[in-house]
Amino acid sequence: MKEIGLNLYSVRNLISTEEDLLATAKKLKEAGYSFFQYSGAAWDPKRIKRMVDEVGTPVRLTHIPQDRLLNETEKVIEENLSFGNNNIGLGAMGWDILTDEKKCKEHIEKYNKVGEIMQKNGCKFFWHHHNFEFIQYNGQPIFDYIIENAPYINYTLDTYWLQLSGVSIIEYLEKLKGRIGCVHLKDFKTKFFIDEKEIPRFVPEIESVGYGVINFQDVINKMREVGVEHYFVEQDNAADLPDTFNQVERSVKYLKKEIK
């Protein structure tokens, strides 16, 4: 692979100040990343533009808080366009609505309207899913309901959360053909340990790309087939580990060396 991006949320512990952001962005570029998703640091369009201009790494996706997406849609569009980005996303749907089908569906309709406004202004709205979108109402996953009923919503498909949900990554790529402009690449592994009560535990864990169980060559072949434009490594847990930079560096090295 040639062009690979990183969701900066993965290194949020390294970008807390403007100077840290610039230094980390330069280091990530040297490691092989070509562009970024801006997330996980203070929202300042001027700061973001400075990074884009000085480091030469465009921002091709952002995650914006729910209240701003819903109540300041036009302002959010203006801010993103100021640093050259027209892909604007929701990081996660609200937990508080998951147990209320009516409220959840009303919420989805509001985001569909956000997507319509963005489309009219030359932007696209992207929904980043997790595993909880696979909660079912009357036998249908929430995610499938969104796909069928919200035509102005595009998707940032996430390999880890699909794997954890127990669904086929390939099948959802096909199902969303033409609506997946961005993807999050992160690997999946099972961690084994014995807890304090001496009970064996098996828990899912995010891993660097190529170091878990997902067949990324097959997955990326399908992503190319369905028209994915922007590939972002995302490792939510990297910022909590002592070797944060190494965690994301080995992902980009794997993708550049091993994926044809």
Feature roles, as predicted:
Residues 1-86, 256-260:
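N-terminal pre-domain/capping segments
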Residues 2-8, 36-38, 59-64, 88-90, ...:
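Hydrophobic faces of well-ordered beta-strands that scaffold small-molecule active sites
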Residues 13-18, 35-47, 64-73, 95-99, ...:
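Acidic-and-aromatic substrate-binding clefts and catalytic sites of carbohydrate-active enzymes
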Residues 21, 45, 73, 104-107, ...:
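Aromatic/hydrophobic pocket-lining residues that form the small-molecule binding cavity
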Residues 26, 30, 54, 58, ...:
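Active-site acidic/histidine proton-transfer and metal-coordination neighborhood
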Residues 120-213:
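Acidic/histidine-rich catalytic cores of soluble enzymes
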Residues 214-220, 226, 230-234:
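H/E-rich (His + Asp/Glu) clusters that bind or coordinate divalent metals
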Residues 242-260:
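C-terminal helical cap(s) of enzyme catalytic domains, especially alpha/beta-barrels
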